[in-house]
């Protein structure tokens, strides 16, 4: 038995210690004997006598080697003969009779292609040939390998390679072939779709792709061939992926897809019918992004008829809930999507149908004497009513529905929900209440009287004993809209009853449930009502009284005997601690030094009890600094120690995130009292920000902390300046380009915020240097800085007013110091944009900044 086989067996051991030892020994062996390890693996893969698990692991290990950049240099040092040996053996193993070996080899080849394709390896050409081989296994494995190569290479593939891969897939969607081949082609194709945009831009190629998929379904429909159900499913998913990426190119071709999907709407396979409906929902998503209903508007009548028919023909299954009605749920989502993109005619038709449902003879009889109806009549009545509410839920996403319809239906819904425990379709009705809040809360929030009546009704519903916990959770979600969107002045007088209702739910029997956790959500909402209520004397008095109860609950939460599991105990503690944090951050309570210390000790007990630091704890500890340095100073050293610990665990970026926020709160509260801890803090933050895997949000928080540190530190912080300046330069380079059409919304928002934090940090550093008479340090950077901050206020960057104000102040500060030398870099057009935006703003602070820069730049304009 060879050494590498022995190591593989260790790696596959069920014993954790043996497995870890084997993995380390394998890595060491492969690092010292790189080629031998690879060649041995290849020999094992092609050896039919070797155990299957060892052969599979060999392929997996080769993939690991080629996937990690640390081995690339060793691979590049191999001779041409050695490289060819590895390639030939791997390619040969694709012909293995064993599917497991073919799959493992396919992944290894794909990983190798990432290294060798740019050097001219003809693997695409070879796989193209084998994808047309008479042996079906060759075809299938070639297609799988193509998919894996695309997965590894992504957008780095050349267009000619993409074209070759695409042709191979299309050629294998031929009804003359074995259905196992067709299945693989249609299944793997969904993963290729994101990378064929150029092909979709070409009308002929686009038509060819759509026709190839569509013809398979059409041939099945006219029964010229019985297409496997899984293939039909794959093709429908392919259409979904095509629309997810290429709605903007599909208008001329969509009529073919539409015709096919309408047939599938009413097929006898509910799963396929649901997928065909989902195709239209995906199309709506694309239209929503493009801000047009240029395709769906042409099909409103047909869609309305088809969707109504789906609801009429579904099984009379009154089982309520999100997971019980596959096609029905998909249809409801589609109605919602069609409404969101503005298909008014369809919405009107659906509202008309709802009215017909609720006013037919069966429903009139049910309204008068439901209890005396026969069982079949009751089922029919409930079925009709459920259909009406399911459709109405979808329609509610149309924001231009007549307000009278909304407010009238709201009262009927609440009336229905008061008998919730005897209503088999309660969940369907409750969701309508939620969707009214989601899309039309402005109608509830318009008048104090309407708002108060609605709030009182929701509180009454929450006071009821509701058997269906999902419905109770929906009511809590409605309460979230009241708290988050409601006028704070409107719910001031209800603050006590809202808090008491939520806490009663949080601690009621069976409220803690993993599937539907009423307890944790109630605690979350309690924190939110405290955050959002106004800081009136009466409210603060109420919250101060509640805080005493909260403190007692925290003490009780430290007793594990009060809970069924450790997880339950931890989650209740987290909820309580988060409420305390809300009280602290939003200054809804007052505390003296002794009370602050008492809260700290409870949190410390919780940390010790769990034997780990957790994010709610570090967040709350940082928030205690908001009560002022004089009160916080007694626990400062202990809290800062926890902050430093939180910044150690780079694997838990969420904990780091809260640690950075806590550090910032404490630094701002303590001023220069915490200077002694700054060097340790800087070292920790620099390690975090240099981590290549750092999340975007955490990077922004690091910049914010740097700003706070430089504003408040003494000259000793200067040793970190070169590294931070380089960080700024790198940040500018990475965020200089304006947004493009392909950039997603999250990236646009991140870059906007990131640019703002760069400017804030520049301001902080400049103030620091000015205070210590070292502002000349900026001289070597000023050219690049001015160009950057002048550029990012231009309209194509869509700058926020806060960014414009920050840039204005920064330019003013720079100009006052550097004066004439800045004339070379200043962009008058950018200054004009800044002046114009500040003049348009109604914010008093912006007016002050405007006055400042008008005075500062007066000589610049006079000399221009």
Where is each model-derived feature located?
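Karyopherin-beta/Importin-beta family HEAT-repeat alpha-solenoid scaffold
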Residues: 1-864
């Amino acid at each position: 038995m060879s050494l590498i086989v022995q190591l593989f067996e260790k790696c596959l051991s069920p014993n954790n210690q043996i497995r870890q030892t084997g993995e380390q020994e394998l890595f060491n062996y492969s690092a010292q004997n790189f080629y031998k390890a690879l060649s041995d693996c290849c020999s094992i893969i092609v050896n039919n006598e070797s155990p299957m698990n060892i052969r599979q692991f060999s392929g997996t290990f080769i993939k690991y080697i080629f996937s990690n950049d640390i081995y690339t240099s060793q691979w590049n040092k191999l001779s041409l003969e050695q490289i060819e040996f590895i390639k030939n053996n791997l390619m040969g193993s694709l012909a293995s009779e064993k599917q497991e070996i073919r799959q493992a080899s396919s992944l290894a080849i794909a990983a190798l292609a990432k290294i060798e394709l740019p050097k001219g390896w003809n693997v695409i050409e070879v796989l193209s040939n084998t994808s047309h081989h008479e042996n079906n296994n060759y075809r299938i494995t070639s297609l799988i390998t193509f998919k894996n190569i695309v997965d590894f290479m992504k957008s780095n593939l050349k267009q000619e390679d993409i074209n070759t891969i695409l042709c191979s897939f299309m050629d294998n969607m031929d009804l003359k072939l074995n259905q196992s081949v067709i299945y693989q082609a249609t299944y793997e194709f969904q993963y290729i779709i994101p990378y064929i945009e150029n092909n979709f831009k070409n009308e002929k190629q686009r038509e060819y792709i759509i026709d190839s998929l569509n013809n398979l379904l059409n041939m099945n429909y006219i029964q010229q061939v019985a297409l496997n159900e899984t293939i039909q499913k794959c093709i429908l998913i392919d259409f979904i992926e095509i629309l997810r990426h290429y709605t903007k190119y599909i208008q001329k071709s969509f009529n073919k897809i539409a015709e096919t999907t309408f047939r599938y709407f009413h097929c006898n396979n509910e799963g396929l019918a649901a997928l065909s409906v989902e195709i239209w929902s995906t199309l709506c998503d694309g239209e929503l992004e493009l801000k047009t209903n240029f395709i769906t508007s042409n099909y409103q009548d047909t869609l309305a008829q088809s969707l109504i028919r789906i609801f009429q023909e579904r099984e009379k299954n009154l089982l309520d809930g999100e997971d019980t009605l596959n096609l029905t749920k998909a249809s409801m989502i589609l109605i919602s999507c069609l409404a969101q993109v503005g298909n008014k005619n369809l919405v009107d038709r659906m509202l008309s149908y709802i009215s017909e449902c609720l006013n037919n003879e069966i429903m009139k009889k049910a309204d008068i004497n439901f209890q005396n109806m026969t069982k079949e009549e009751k089922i029919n009545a409930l079925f009709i009513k459920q259909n009406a509410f399911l459709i109405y839920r979808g329609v509610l996403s149309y924001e231009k529905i007549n307000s009278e319809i909304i407010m009238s239906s709201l009262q009927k819904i609440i009336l229905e929900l008061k008998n919730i425990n005897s209503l088999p379709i309660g969940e369907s009705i409750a969701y309508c209440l939620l969707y009214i809040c989601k899309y039309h809360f402005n109608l509830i929030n318009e008048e104090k009287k309407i708002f108060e009546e609605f709030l009182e009704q929701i509180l009454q519903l929450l006071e009821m004993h509701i058997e269906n916990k999902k419905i109770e959770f929906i009511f809590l979600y409605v309460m979230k809209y009241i708290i988050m969107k409601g006028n704070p002045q409107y719910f001031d007088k209800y603050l006590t009853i809202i808090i008491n209702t939520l806490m009663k739910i949080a601690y009621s029997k069976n409220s803690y449930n993993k599937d539907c956790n009423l307890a944790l959500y109630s605690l979350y909402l309690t924190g939110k009502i405290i955050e959002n209520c106004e800081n009136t004397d009466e409210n603060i008095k109420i919250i101060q009284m509640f805080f005493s109860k909260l403190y007692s609950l925290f003490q009780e939460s430290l007793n594990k005997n009060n809970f069924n599991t450790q997880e339950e105990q931890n989650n209740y503690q987290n909820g309580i601690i988060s409420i305390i944090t809300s009280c602290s951050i939003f200054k809804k309570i007052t505390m003296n030094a002794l009370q602050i210390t008492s809260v700290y000790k409870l949190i410390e007990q919780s940390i010790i009890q769990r034997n780990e630091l957790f994010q709610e704890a570090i967040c709350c500890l940082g928030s205690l600094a908001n009560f002022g340095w004089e009160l916080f100073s007694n626990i400062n050293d202990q809290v800062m120690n926890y902050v430093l610990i939180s910044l150690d665990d780079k694997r838990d970026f969420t904990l780091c995130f809260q640690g950075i926020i806590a550090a910032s709160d404490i630094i701002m509260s303590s001023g220069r009292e915490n200077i002694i801890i700054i060097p340790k803090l800087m070292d920790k933050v620099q390690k975090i920000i240099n981590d290549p895997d750092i999340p975007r949000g955490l990077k922004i928080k690091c910049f914010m902390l740097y700003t706070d540190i430089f504003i408040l530190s003494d000259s000793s912080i200067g040793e970190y300046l070169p590294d931070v300046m380089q960080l700024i330069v790198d940040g500018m380079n990475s965020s200089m380009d304006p947004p493009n059409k392909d950039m997603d919304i999250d990236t646009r928002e991140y870059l906007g915020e990131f640019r703002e934090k760069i400017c804030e940090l520049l301001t902080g550093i400049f103030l620091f240097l000015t205070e210590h008479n070292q502002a000349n340090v900026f001289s070597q950077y000023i050219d690049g800085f001015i160009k950057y901050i002048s550029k990012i206020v231009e309209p194509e960057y869509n700058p926020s007013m806060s960014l414009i104000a920050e840039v204005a102040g920064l330019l003013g500060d720079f100009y006052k110091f550097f004066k004439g030398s800045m004339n070379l870099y200043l962009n008058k057009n950018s200054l004009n944009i800044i002046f114009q935006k500040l003049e348009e703003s109604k914010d008093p602070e912006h007016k002050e900044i405007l006055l400042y820069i008008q005075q500062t730049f007066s000589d610049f304009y006079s000399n221009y």
